[in-house]
Amino acid sequence: MISPGPHNDFENYGGVSSRVGYHADRKRIIHFNLTHLSGVGLHAGGDLPFMPTVGDLGRSPVAGKQAGSYVTSKTDKEAYASSFEEERAGAGWYEVRLKDSGIAVSLSAAPRSAIARFRFPKDQAGAVVFCPANDVKGIVDSFLRIDPEGHRVSGWADTGGFSDAPFNPKKLPYRIYFTASFDAPFQKYGIWETAGRRDGVAAAQGPAVAAFVGFDSAGASEVTMRVAISYVDAAGAEANLAAEAARWDEPELRRRTRVEWNERLGALNLAGAPEADRRVWNSCLYLNLLHPNYFEDADGRYRGFDDQIHRVPAGEHFFANYSIWDTYRSTGPLQALIVPREAGGMARTMLRAAAEGGGGLPNWTLNNNETACMGCYPGATLLANLIAFGAQGIDLKEAHLRLVASATRKRPLKTYGGWDALEEYEAQGFKPRSASETLEYNVSDFALARFCRRVGDESNAERFMRRAASWRKLVHPERRGIWARQADGSWLEPLTPETGRGFTEGCAEQYLWFVPHDTASLLSRLGSPEALRERLSNFFDPFLIGGWNASKPKYWCGNEPTMGAPFVFNYLGEPWRAQELVSRVAATFTDGPGGMPGDDDLGATSASYLFFSMGLFPYIPGVGGFIITGPRLPYIDMTLRPGVVVKIRASNAGPRNPYIQSLTVNGKAYRRTWIDLETLAANGGATLSFAMGPEPMRSWGSRPEDAPPSPGSEIKLPPGYEHVPVKPNLYRDLRAQGNPSSAVTQMQNPDLSSLEPPLGAANLLSRAPQAIIRVIGPRPMNGASEGMVPRLCDGLGAQNHDDPSRCAWFDGGSGRLVMDLGLTRTVSEVRCYSWHRGNRAPQKFLLWGAQGPKQPEADFTNAAGSGWTLLADVNTEKLGDGGAHLTRIRGKSGGSLGDYRFLLWITPEAEQGTFFTELEVAGP
């Protein structure tokens, strides 16, 4: 639960940001925090900053805090920053020397508490500064109390958020409590507010307060702080301290951690490997044991997803921080294999969260909040994987109830635990405009089907197997690829390998290979084996390491959607190619800074390294088994449970010998490229003996019967299942009924400072204060009040991308807006602004005009005789997703658009709603 460590990176300062607060290239430690997450893709953690220092404490850590701002300034945050040297770390501890102040800092962690030791320079007055406001995400409120008699500092911070800058800690809120006990008396103490320092004041509350305690320079030069946290209450923090760090000194705490770490290492024991490989192996295993982490206090209490206090049974844990879209692929199976008792607790936590949240299984949890990050429904896949790979103590009846209920009900607005677009998905077989989420839904459905079959629910097993086959509806028969479809069944353009439209964190070619439950059927629809081998070889040449490569139609080894792509070669009769690729990918992991090809995403990437190095990979979600690719390391013992040990032995293993020459399982020759977990676990555990070599053994594993299974092909589908009829589309029909009378200029990421509203005297809205914008429907518009959307004509642009306080958008995308200018006026130009980080920035609408005095009916289906004239047909999608978009609509020959009182925007059906920030109308 606690994870103390250094913080030296904020909000893209320096051009590159670490979302967890530490970057090896940074030269100064800003402060230390009590919480961190491992390799998370968005800013999280970084709670309760503190910093030891020396001197007169003349700098305020909150002086620059602006009213209404959640985050303090960079200057404030770095008020007591220091350059550093002599960093050292091990399992559960960290040490560093702060060069500017000369302070040696040592941190050691227990589950809910920590010991911090500060060795101050001789004859210098040391102090420790506490500043909750300098949380990387900002805070809403905080409280600090100093107890000089008891040598304690305690308090809490209200924070939250899970995003890139700018931050909003009011979203996904939580309160974190702390208490810190010192072994030296306070010579001085006080607090800071934005107005300045107040010595001798023992308490402060607010979003911009800090506290300090100072020590006698003539006394002990070494001061120890014992600190604990709680998400329940202040008493919980005190009890956690008493149960853990208060009972031990630093050597004893480290000894206990070392003993536990060695036990964990024994579950995945490595021998005979070079030291650098051992460091990478141990580091990746360590990262996979950090999350999900304990969230309950020592007395078993925890704050649930309903924000109420609950208690787990004795010996049980409530886990927090699941990056499920990432971790179901690798971390979940690994944890079920090597820590099955804890993995069972993680599954039980998911079931508790579902019950407390009133919904289904969680998706991406941060503490006791569901972030709904990454969409899809991966909770079902993770739970099925935990069960399939051996997690212990899971109530299968409760799991079955939650899984089926969640998979068969629509997700309620602003909650989680159901399937988004469920009605469309069940009726049509795909989620409109999202190929990647359809593919992910299929994977979850397949895992659900396997689970239902396990518990004897054949009816739902067949239902979910049929749903899992709907990826077939996204395969373009002529272009031989997978793309998204619109709600009417038409294809979502463009149909190119690099398009990201309809794909999450990837493009069409990256997601093409992602049908792990039915890879053989996928390949049969994409071309001949010879053509596919060439296409797949080109996909990996070159493969991409690091950076953001979502729009590049190549293998991106640092991101999850392509994690299983190398193993497709096993289905094409060339497993030796997969062996080479997996060895090359594993070689991108090093024991230095930046030693991982992408975000770790709470263990997902590091778990893939462990599986790659073992020569086994859990390719098919929900199925307890592995694709075989050949180990990189010579001697691995994987203990599944007491008395069951899988032994992996690989002669000549290493980066220069990536190819399997032969394999025996328990002494018998084995040529298949798949092995079941049941086989590995039988009779006390199997022994896999590989002979590795520098040249491919093309005869091994290359027969059709050697290929891995493709269990999704078991379902019998009706004739014509893959055919998708294209329905009538009102938006498309209306487009065809008019001839736009305008010239349209489209810009992406323009310099909005030079185009910011208002237009001045040319802005008709400034001359027509009675101008209004009304929502006609058919869908509600976020940002509307009683059908009006004044924020779209208030002369104010958005402050940043994805700003819901300044933007308005239709749920589902389809809707109509009418602007009434009060009088018929000459309109020379219409400007439309939008701003969003993702696929809601592009603008897609039809603009119509009508004269007064009475507004024609806006809900028309036939333009002829409607009273409306089509002025513009706008689609800025070709500019790409993300950023700021501006559309300028003017007369074709530089003249006016015409004389109009009413302007009508029609947005298309089943589109995600554009984040409009402002609509402007200019006159002569």
Predicted regions, residues:
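Short, surface-exposed tryptophan/glycine-enriched loops
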Residues: G882-Y900
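Short beta-strand-plus-loop segments that form exposed binding edges in beta-rich domains
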Residues: W905-Q912
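Extended extracellular/luminal ectodomain segments enriched in beta-structured repeat modules
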Residues: A125, G813-S814, G822-E829, G898-Y900
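Disordered, acidic Ser/Thr/Pro-rich linker "stalks" and the adjacent N-terminal cap
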Residues: P719-T824, W835-R840, A872-G883, E918-P924
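Non-cytosolic beta-sandwich-type ligand-binding/adhesion modules
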Residues: R825, Y833-L879
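Short coil-to-beta strand junction motifs in C2/discoidin
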Residues: P631-L633, P655-Y659, G838-L846
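Accessory carbohydrate-recognition regions in carbohydrate-active enzymes
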Residues: M1-L439, C452-K473, R479, A484-Q510, ...
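Exposed low-complexity, polar/acidic, P/S/T/G-rich flexible segments that act as propeptides
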Residues: D706-I715, V827, G913-P924
